[in-house]
Amino acid sequence: MFPTPLTAFALASFMAVVASSVNGSGTINFGSSVEHLSVRVSGSSGRATFEDKAAGGNVNGQIDINCVNIAGNTATLSGLVTHSNKKSMIGQEGVFRIVDNGSKKATPDMASLINFHQPGTSTDCNAGEFDLTPVKGNFTIQ
């Protein structure tokens, strides 16, 4: 049998490995833009897909998430666009925020549109202001 201090240390170490996650999908309407977003993130990496229907045309693609900042029920995520039907977006950084307000029957979850920019020219998941709007869908932040 392990001495008590070693057992407590082992238990604390095991509990510290629990990774955060952000999962779900939803559609937001923001002005004339309708954006559908799906997210699957565990720890500090994962993928997000987007479909944006706007007056300027339809754009879709995938973001490889490499930065995740979770504070309570709010997650700010960023990463690089790796696929898109608009080739000029590939290599750009996308950053967005999601707020998990509980189950679908509770207050709707919130999300921002994805803000795209050249890497290093604006904020990543560690900063930024976001206009949030209600989501038709459900996101889970753990």
What role is predicted for each listed range?
Residues 17-27:
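Boundary/junction segments of secreted and surface-exposed precursor proteins
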Residues 24, 53, 65, 101-102, ...:
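Short linear motifs in intrinsically disordered/low-complexity regions
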Residues 1-19:
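Sec-dependent, cleavable N-terminal signal peptides
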Residues 106-142:
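C-terminal partner/receptor-binding element of secreted or periplasmic proteins
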Residues 85-89, 95-117:
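Extended soluble regions of mature proteins
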Residues 12, 19-20, 44, 111:
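Intrinsically disordered, low-complexity segments enriched in Ser/Pro/Gly/Ala and basic residues
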Residues 30-98:
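Predominantly extracellular/secreted and cell-surface proteins with exposed
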Residues 20-22, 42, 75, 98, ...:
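Compositionally biased, low-complexity repeat tracts
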